[in-house]
Amino acid sequence: MPEKKEVVVRTVGVEKNFMLGRIELKVLKGIDLEINQGEYISIMGPSGSGKTTLFNMIGGLDKPSNGRVYIDEVDVAQLDAFELAWLRCRKIGYIFQTFNLIPVMTALENVTLPMIFAGTSHDESVDKGRQLLELVGLGERIQHKPFELSGGQQQRVAIARAFANSPAIILADEPTGNLDLKTGKEIIGLLKEMNRKQGVSVITATHDLKMLDISDRVIWIRDGQIERIENRADLNIQVGEVEGE
């Protein structure tokens, strides 16, 4: 009998509504989903499909209008502001399309900052920050500030920062959106390598078909609902052909 995997994210009947003037806009319409420890998941769909809203629900950046979101079986909606901040700091690492590095800080300082916020000592934070930057291939750039780094290098710093507090989940919102094709492929490969080495669940919201090659499952969202969920082995898309290679 195969070993049952631990569920790190579970959504039950998640709905999200927004008011547009006097009109109620239903963005998510009852999302039921389970994501296991160590999985690499891509959430894909057209603009306006609800994938970014679902991404924000999973990350504790917003709360559902109805339904429940559980992170490690903790109901996110029941947490107060302090508890939610602790959860986001310790359980979740974030990677953004626009990198969101602090421009006056070095690469090392950007990576150590989440650890300092979490109460890790300065020396331990610096040691781990160096190790993470080495791991993402920036061991020689730790004292460089963001403006001294290329877009791909800045995203590598952002990836190292996301892993700073040894999270259970990495949320990557369009992580290749601001990168050229070659650099985007390098970042995708790095994310998969970190996923495999660290055993962390990676969840991406993306339009990038290159993500299909490394995802364990792809969740297709359309009109606020899960249209289908496909395992990598079941996908028929040949990414090389899509990219014109």
Identify the residue ranges that each predicted region occupies.
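Residue-level detector of flexible, active-site-proximal loop/helix-junction positions
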Residues: 83, 225, 233
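ABC-family P-loop ATPase nucleotide-binding domain
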Residues: 1-17, 228-245
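Flexible, glycine-rich phosphate/dinucleotide-binding loops
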Residues: 188, 211, 227, 235-236
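H-loop (His-switch) and adjacent beta-strand-loop-beta switch element
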Residues: 218-230
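ABC family nucleotide-binding domain
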Residues: 7-221
